[in-house]
Amino acid sequence: MDLQVQIIXFLLISVTVIMSRGENVLTQSPAIMAASLGQKVTMTCSASSSVSSSYLHWYQQKSGASPKPLIHRTSNLASGVPARFSGSGSGTSYSLTISSVEAEDDATYYCQQWSGYPFGSGTKLEIKR
């Protein structure tokens, strides 16, 4: 097989992989929520098709900062994340819960299927002061 044919085949495979990545849409609910200090909150992540619990992750993005890992593999806290955060779910339905909201939790939260894939639509948590 000559080089041109190899390059074309590689490009076709790459396009197929990239297009298949976009098939599963993650929709988060609610889009915006407000909570008082100490309140328990739960936000959801719904997938258009089933996601393995080993590959569902949550990120926290504070204003002006990059997203930071929060929970990996559905329910495992990332290093340094407080125990008030927890994750659960399976199949097409996942959730992130904060058992007692603190002021520093004011951020946007994103779910993600597989590392490197697009984030879900996001939930912005606003803290009532």
UniProtKB/Swiss-Prot annotation:
Region (Framework-4): 119-128
Region Complementarity-determining-2, annotated ranges: 73-79
GO biological process, one term: adaptive immune response
Keywords for this protein: Adaptive immunity, Disulfide bond, Immunity, Immunoglobulin, Signal
Region called Framework-3, residue ranges: 80-111
UniProt region (Framework-1), positions on chain: 23-45
Top-level taxon of origin: Eukaryota
General remark: This protein, in which there is a deletion of two amino acids at the V-J recombination site (after position 118), is synthesized but not secreted in cells that express and secrete the normal kappa chain S107.
Protein name: Ig kappa chain V-IV region S107B
Organism: Mus musculus (Mouse)
